[in-house]
């Protein structure tokens, strides 16, 4: 059944089960959709439920040289500080390669605490690599190696203002990131990750202006409530107004020649323009945890890094030797769908949002079957995506030249 919404003076028709949408007269849209519905539903079903692990997040150490108040990794684990030996890392990477994993992302705590091991691994194994770092331990030669390997690099920065950023991430962090931006000057696979919280949500538009011309992609992730500290720092109701202003600033910068995209929003927009092409796997249900990727830490394997510290979701590292049993272990996360959540099952945006994050919801309430604490935020972003479509700004967010058109409104 098509839902009708009015956005920016235009009537949108949306099929929530497939994310098909159109602007036009209901009778013509319904006829067009009926002719293609089965194929679109089949495609969405495959995208949502296919298990195909191609990415592994590896936390090679539990240690971090920072103590961010919203960290999703429990403090006792970071204090324990277990790290992988190179031999263990080598063993893990060998098994991943044998089972079809193509992309390895070194993740936090802080991966550069063991930079010698991960850089050696990058020389010894032929994966597509990524790293997420706070950049405080990054040296120029490290940046050169990462660029030589074509690695995607995500650097944390929470504000364009030094005082706020260092309040959240510790003294000296802002200056370290500024040095890193110089090291990576012009590198296309660099992005900045902002954790949006009650101390910095008002800085979102300024953050876009600050980063425009420095990076082409930034992520603006609302803080996860996986930890008590994260829940304490959630931004207040209405923070999405600043987020939407930031989206508009990104579009304005792009039009003026300084292209920058907020990746989280681009993924929502992609959920309408090309639903099964989405890269980020948080806003679909089941999410990508244990389905498209999993996380390997020094103490075990989890469907996603957000579950680290939750013993009931952990598999021993030895489970890598029995791949099919390991994948089966994470079925409990793959079974979690929006259709099981009372507030979500009839929502028109259920396959744009996915009710994230199951780890966050479980940590807070003991069940994964509740709506997202950011429900209203995702609804407003979905409507903003429709607004961007209605006003013809899609190409200022997504690179349409990289996509193949299958259906067009003009076909009616």
From Swiss-Prot:
Highest rank taxon of the organism: Archaea
GO molecular-function term, one example from the UniProt record: oxidoreductase activity
Gene3D superfamilies: Aldolase class I
Chain ranges of the Radical SAM core domain: 50-264
Keyword Iron-sulfur applies: yes
Binding positions for [4Fe-4S] cluster per the UniProt entry: 64, 68, 71
Coiled-coil regions, chain positions: none
Keywords, in A-Z order: 4Fe-4S, Iron, Iron-sulfur, Metal-binding, S-adenosyl-L-methionine
Keyword Phosphoprotein applies: no
Cofactor: [4Fe-4S] cluster
One Pfam entry name: Radical_SAM
Family the UniProt entry places it in: Belongs to the radical SAM superfamily. Anaerobic sulfatase-maturating enzyme family.
Alphabetical list of NCBIfam families matching this protein: rSAM_cobopep, rSAM_more_4Fe4S
Protein name per Swiss-Prot or TrEMBL: Uncharacterized protein AF_2204
């Amino acid at each position: 059944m098509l839902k009708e919404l009015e956005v920016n003076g235009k009537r949108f028709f949306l099929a929530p089960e497939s994310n098909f949408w159109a602007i036009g007269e209901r009778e013509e849209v319904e006829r067009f959709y009926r002719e293609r519905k089965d194929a679109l539903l089949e495609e969405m079903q495959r995208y949502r439920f296919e298990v195909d692990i191609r990415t592994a997040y590896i936390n090679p150490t539990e240690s971090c040289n920072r103590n961010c108040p919203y960290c999703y990794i429990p403090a006792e684990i970071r204090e324990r500080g277990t790290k992988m030996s190179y031999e263990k890392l080598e063993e893990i990477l060998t098994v991943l390669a044998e089972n079809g994993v193509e992309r390895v992302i070194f993740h936090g705590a802080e991966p550069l605490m063991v930079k010698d091991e991960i850089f050696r691994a990058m020389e010894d194994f032929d994966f597509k690599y990524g790293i997420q770092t706070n950049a405080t331990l990054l040296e120029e030669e490290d940046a050169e190696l990462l660029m030589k390997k074509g690695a995607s690099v995500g650097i944390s920065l929470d504000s364009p203002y030094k005082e706020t950023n260092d309040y959240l991430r510790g003294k000296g962090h802002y200056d370290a990131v500024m040095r890193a931006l110089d090291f990576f000057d012009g590198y296309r696979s660099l992005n900045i990750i902002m954790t949006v919280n009650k101390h910095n949500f008002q800085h979102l538009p300024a953050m876009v202006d600050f980063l425009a011309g420095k990076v082409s992609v930034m992520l603006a992730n609302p803080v996860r409530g996986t930890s008590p500290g994260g829940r304490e720092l959630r931004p207040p109701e209405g923070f999405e107004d600043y987020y939407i202003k930031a989206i508009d600033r990104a579009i304005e910068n792009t039009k003026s020649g300084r292209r920058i995209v907020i990746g989280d929003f681009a993924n929502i927009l992609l959920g309408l323009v090309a639903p099964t092409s989405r890269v980020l796997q948080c806003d679909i249900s089941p999410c990508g945890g244990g389905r498209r990727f999993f996380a390997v830490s020094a103490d075990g394997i989890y469907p996603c890094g957000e579950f680290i510290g939750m013993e009931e979701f952990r598999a021993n590292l030895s489970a890598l030797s029995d791949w099919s049993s390991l994948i089966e272990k994470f079925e409990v996360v793959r079974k979690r769908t929006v259709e099981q959540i009372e507030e979500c099952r009839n929502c028109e945006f259920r396959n744009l949002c996915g009710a994230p994050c199951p780890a966050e919801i479980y940590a807070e309430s003991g069940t994964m079957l509740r709506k997202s604490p950011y429900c209203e935020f995702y609804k407003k972003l979905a409507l903003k995506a429709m607004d961007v479509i209605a006003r013809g700004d899609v190409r200022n967010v997504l690179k349409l030249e990289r996509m193949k058109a299958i259906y067009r409104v003009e076909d009616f």
